[in-house]
């Protein structure tokens, strides 16, 4: 297994990080920030662990001095610093004293970007040819090397393989791990139906991919210029369209063997010339392209066919795709007139729910970004060529050169000297030795390690918390804490997959985990959680705050406000609190509350109480207060533990004008009415216990009826004016009296001795919006 970034001690180390900052440019303007954004997590990770960061990257191809003037990495500094929320230093050298001096001045957490590594290609292609001296020089600038440039992982350059071969410690960054995980899942854990869409200009670029992927897919849709080679092989006229004559034989044999899986264009958008053209359609014979015409894009009938095989068609018995891989455009997307086929692919995939979709290739990604549909795809690869070579089971030199986790440096150094990088990437970084990894034994090896890549139960909850629906961190990386200096923020669910820990989830990059499911509408759903007594108090207090009036003035506009006016106002507030259901429905969720037996009052203190929505103080409910001429010194906490619950009764009308809460087992409790003012309802405080303190507004007790337990003594106070302050002390009855009361109370269900003896947690229900 390859070393990961979490295996390294980064504190106060000079950390060389190879990134892929090869952003698309239009003049001097960056047209897509995706590659910069994807680099941020690794930089942040090193920053937070005290590393001194030296960044290397290329930008485009540099063949002449004119290219050098246009391809300076200084263009990305501002965007990088903005996304990183940290200053970024820049040195316009790839080697020299100026660069070395800047590195020596770095402090932990500092970030330094050096100039475009491909400027060295002006010196006998030193970078692209992996010049040994250049690799050694760059390696000498740091203590640790991290390769996080998946886009160049299929190339052996001085800035990846050269550095990794000459430095003591090397590891893979977060982006590379994410990429490998996504492609591994695509090829080895795909759900059927599996639809692959391949476009682009050349069959020769994708022959190996075609041969590798065809056995795994249910349908293979071929578009772009490469489709014309297959049409030509079938004897269909393609006019002056581009095709590869030397691949006709391959296309013929491929179609003969897999014709039942392959979907080719059945009509075309044509043009007489390549530039400044408008689409023309051959309505008489849509399949044929007349002479002197060029195929520029797929036609409307092909678009309809693409939609059917991606989204499904019940009439034709075609199921919606569950796994999709797309690489390469359907037409000449440089011109807006010929983007329809590619846009149709984006539209179809984005409408799927619960499917796993992977996209690679710059042109395909550009179309997705044009529609701002990135979040509707499971994974958008930063490496088009690298992703194809990964699927082809080829060795990716930039990753293969990284140290194995099990290797000592001496073993690794010996391997470097012999240049024995023979690990086949078809078995993604999971073999203990290089000899185990060959494409021939890959299937057997993968099956033998099935337990490592079992799907997590919560896998579909986003990428549930970069909550990139594209990236599901549930199946990334490995679990064990591998270094005392770094907390293990990665856990394993397959040979090369892991999950970000709480530490990383709370960083600035929670967007690394994203929700794949797209909800078409919000629904009100119940959730249930277990709470302790303290949690319930907090929840009740929060609930009361949320259902309170916004201002005192709206609650009590005047001191002369009538009791009926207050009730009407509070009911409107209640409707706002439950916008999608009536209060009667909420009341129905309150059936019966479990009680604590009188025989187990001492043990009851360790048990949590049962509450439902109806137990929370309702905004317009009136209370029955049981008064007694004599009070005892029992604390409220003891009474609460003995009586366990209040039972909501007598909810007679929808507007709750006569609602009462009976507390029949608190017959000696006493509310003493004193001063009532317009704003304060003070908390009950007795002994060592106090209920959550809140304002009169918060409790929404706009209507209050205090009644005694004795029916003959009950009297309703109507039209009271809220002009005095109430200070209420709830005093309890003696334990013996309470036990007798509960024993004699036949209107309530008493728990059996067995039920009381068994510890139990009760549940508190609330309603929340599903996002």
UniProtKB/Swiss-Prot annotation:
Substrate binds at residues 20-22, 35, 58-61, 118, 155. Keywords: ATP-binding, Cytoplasm, Glycolysis, Kinase, Nucleotide-binding, Transferase. ATP binds at residues 206, 295, 334, 361-364. It is an enzyme of class 2 (transferase). Its EC number is 2.7.2.3. It catalyses: (2R)-3-phosphoglycerate + ATP = (2R)-3-phospho-glyceroyl phosphate + ADP. Residues 407-771 are annotated as: Unknown. Residues 1-406 are annotated as: Phosphoglycerate kinase. GO terms for cellular component: cytosol. One of its GO terms (molecular function) is ATP binding. It is found in: Cytoplasm. Pathway: Carbohydrate degradation; glycolysis; pyruvate from D-glyceraldehyde 3-phosphate: step 2/5. PANTHER family: PHOSPHOGLYCERATE KINASE (PTHR11406), PHOSPHOGLYCERATE KINASE 1, CHLOROPLASTIC-RELATED (PTHR11406:SF23). In the N-terminal section; belongs to the phosphoglycerate kinase family. Monomer. This is Phosphoglycerate kinase.
